């Protein structure tokens, strides 16, 4: 698997999807909010208190108006090719983030597979982007509770959720096969 080409494809699809109009429940096109300006977002990452090996992400819209972020955070690992795959697997699209609202995602960097122990790589930084054409933010492993580095093998991330608890629940359901579609 060439993860680098997959990342480029994911980013290209995400940019295209953010330009797509949002549809209201009546089926009529709704006014599409603009993409969030990077200066209007506060992006955070921290280790989960409840689940080993899980990072909690949050992004807050600090502006006074609604705007769009990608509905899946793009999470990459230092010099490694590729990005964490979304669970559930869905096409990229925009997610409206209301003014002064925060959404959450959960990221598992190391799979539970038997191959993970031998195949895992260790990185000293995790990079997160909320809108494909933004620079995003890099979080050092030490600040993420991993002084020896973050171990990575088949990483996955949830879509943005309404609460940190919901994000971790979706991650658990999706990675154990007990999940339902959760957008």
Task: Give the predicted meaning of each segment.
Residues 96-97, 110-114:
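Mature extracytoplasmic domains of secretory-pathway proteins
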Residues 1-53, 80-90, 103-110, 119-183:
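Membrane engagement elements in two modes
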Residues 65, 69-102:
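The feature marks short-to-medium sequence segments in extracytoplasmic or secretory-pathway proteins
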Residues 58, 76, 125-127:
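Residue-level detector of beta-strand face positions
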Residues 63, 71-73, 109, 132:
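A mature extracytoplasmic/lumenal domain signature
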